[in-house]
Amino acid sequence: MFDIKVLALDLDGTLTNDQKLVTPRTRAALDAAIEKGVTVVLASGRPTAGIQPLAEELGLDKKGGCILSYNGGKIVDCRTGETLVEKTLDPALVPELCAFAAAQDIAILTYNREGIVCERDKDEWANKECFTTKLPMIHVDDLASYVNYPVCKMLITLDPARRDAVCAAGQQQFAGRADLYPSSPFFIEAVPLGVAKDGSLAELLRRMGLTRETLMACGDGLNDRSMIAYAGVGVAMQNAEQPVKDCADYVTTADNNHDGVAEAVEKFILRED
């Protein structure tokens, strides 16, 4: 018998299907879990504004719950709007990250309150972030000089064939100053050193007076590995990358297009036996 109190859910490739929708069965499972007193945390690399509409669709602004955005860079209480955790990049790294992307001839973007900010606003891979977050693309001529405010992360977007080589080069250049890691075939996250979903969830659990044994985490991407390994019950989607499956306690038989999250919630939270 599992005593899950907190349910952390990655969004893209996990909670939502490939059309970025939450299916009726999954929605019903989440509603039932919330009714049992489980706190739902939407845990994503997306910016906060790119998660807010889904949180409201699920009723977390009224029922309670949290948004964990920027891969753990920020946690917001859905009901009160209070920022519980926030970690930002060293401002000196912003121009260096922009120069790194320019040298690789690839796009890099970040966010403001209105949307996604990028020099290469027509870039195919950068525009995938618009589709994912439902946020508009804002073109600027010089991203490094435009960003005069704290940012929780920057996102490098590129052809999947180049991802691993570029990521390795970035990890070498920014070692000890920022963490770079892939979050999808065409995205590389650049976040403050040590920021990851597991650390921010640990901080949230401490605030709630809970232990990691009460946490269930579901995900599919490499940026989900830390929280899946950390959670009392770590769940990988059937469509997850193999390293994610390797660190999970359970791999769903269904993928994100066939209610994989519902399968896990029904098995570990709703089942009475």
Please annotate each region the language model reported:
Residues 57-61, 85-86, 125-129, 197-198, ...:
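Short, hinge-like loop/turn segments at secondary-structure boundaries
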Residues 2-6, 23, 189-273:
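Mg2+-dependent phosphoryl-transfer enzymes with acidic/Ser/Thr/Gly-rich catalytic loops
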Residues 3-19:
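Asp-based phosphoryl-transfer active-site loop
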Residues 24-125:
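Active-site phosphate-binding/coordination module
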Residues 58, 63, 71, 174-176, ...:
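Short, structured coil segments at secondary-structure junctions
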Residues 37-41, 63-65, 153, 213-214, ...:
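Short active-site oxyanion
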Residues 26, 51-55, 166, 170, ...:
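Hydrophobic packing residues within well-ordered alpha-helices of enzyme cores
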